[in-house]
């Protein structure tokens, strides 16, 4: 027909907008599609929001669930779909036994049968400690988590050593069709940390240093740089670190704090873990951060500023530390 021929020749006079939604990770989507799309990432639901979703799902099928049951359920769910699915399966058990209530035993059965793992919900320590520092990490598409880093230092018998546990030795980058392996950036940033400590007059080679990342969170990237440096400094000088402060930022060879990614989910994770302050790189300041209430956000340019914020009762008669920074690099 002529109208079909005209469409092939001249196109269709319309402006189309195709909207697609997916739960896939960004690196699982073909680059040819991503390059032609405007990507919009939705934040992860908070625990109270997941409770609301689960409670609404239970009300729709006329079943009751206790607050303790909601707490347990939301500890194992990461989105609304998972919460609704767990409610429906647990409600099926209640219907079979002619019960109006969804019990904790029902939810535990769903958890064990589905082999679910709890979400990582780290809380800050109860008091300042030497060598214990609160770092921040991002895992998954947009989930933040508090990262308690432990540092132990002992005098070396001969030449000192450094041992790092809890992080990947190597990273794989690229797509499913092509990827390369490289040394972990998190492990490589330790070398930057040691260089900065040497410029402060310290001798890391005199000590056996052990840095541990507990909790099983996959750490990648150099964003734990200032946290590792603070932990080593605290362990060597025996100065406690404020347990109510969390921090994130890359550290350069000159002692500067460089910007990192995922700053918003990291700040929210610090707030949820009970931290009162969070330290971020100066270059990560954004107007949207002013909308986050309940936590003080401190933007720093140098590692010296980090130490000024976190050390508890440092020696005042003579500071044993100082970083010489090239002013032109700031």
Give short role names for the model-derived ranges.
Residues 1-21:
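AAA+/SF3 P-loop NTPase mechanochemical coupling elements
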Residues 3-5, 69, 263:
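Amphipathic coiled-coil/heptad-repeat helices and related helical stalk/stem segments
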Residues 18, 39-41, 297-299:
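Conserved beta-strand scaffold positions in the cores of enzyme catalytic domains, especially
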Residues 19-22, 37, 50, 73, ...:
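Conserved RecA-like P-loop NTPase ATPase core
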Residues 26-32, 39-104, 199-206, 239-242:
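Conserved C-terminal "switch" segment of AAA+ ATPases
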Residues 43, 66-67, 73-83, 100-104, ...:
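Conserved phosphate/pyrophosphate-binding and hydrolysis machinery centered on Walker-type P-loop NTPases
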Residues 121, 126-133, 147, 153-330:
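Peripheral, non-AAA+ core regions of ATP-driven protein-machinery
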């Amino acid at each position: 027909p002529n109208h079909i021929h005209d469409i092939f020749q001249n196109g269709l006079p319309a402006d189309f907008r195709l909207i697609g939604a997916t739960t896939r990770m960004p690196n699982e989507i073909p680059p040819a599609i991503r390059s032609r799309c405007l990507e919009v990432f939705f934040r992860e639901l908070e625990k109270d929001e997941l409770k609301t979703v689960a409670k609404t799902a239970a009300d729709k099928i006329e079943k009751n669930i206790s607050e303790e049951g909601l707490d347990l359920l939301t500890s194992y769910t990461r989105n609304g779909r998972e919460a609704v699915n767990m409610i429906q399966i647990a409600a099926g058990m209640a219907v079979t036994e002619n019960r109006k209530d969804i019990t904790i035993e029902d939810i535990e059965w769903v958890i064990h049968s589905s082999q679910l793992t709890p979400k990582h919900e780290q809380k800050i320590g109860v008091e300042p400690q030497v060598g214990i520092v609160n770092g921040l990490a991002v895992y998954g598409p947009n989930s933040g988590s508090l990262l308690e880093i432990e540092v132990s230092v002992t005098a070396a018998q001969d030449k000192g050593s450094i041992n790092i546990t809890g992080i990947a030795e190597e990273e794989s980058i690229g797509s499913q069709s092509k990827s390369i392996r490289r040394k972990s950036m998190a492990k490589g940033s330790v070398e930057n940390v040691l260089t900065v400590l040497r410029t402060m007059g310290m001798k890391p080679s005199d000590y056996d240093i052990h840095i541990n990342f507990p909790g099983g969170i996959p750490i990648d990237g150099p964003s734990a740089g200032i946290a590792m440096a603070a932990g080593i400094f605290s362990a060597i000088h025996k100065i406690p670190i404020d347990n109510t402060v969390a921090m994130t930022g890359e550290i350069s060879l000159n002692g500067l704090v460089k910007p990192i990614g995922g700053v918003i989910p990291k700040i929210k994770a610090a707030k949820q873990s009970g931290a009162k302050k969070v330290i971020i790189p100066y270059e990560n300041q954004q107007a949207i951060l002013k909308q986050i209430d309940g936590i003080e956000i401190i933007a720093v340019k140098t590692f010296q500023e980090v130490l000024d914020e976190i050390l508890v009762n440092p020696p005042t008669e003579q500071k044993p530390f100082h970083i010489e920074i090239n002013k032109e690099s700031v």
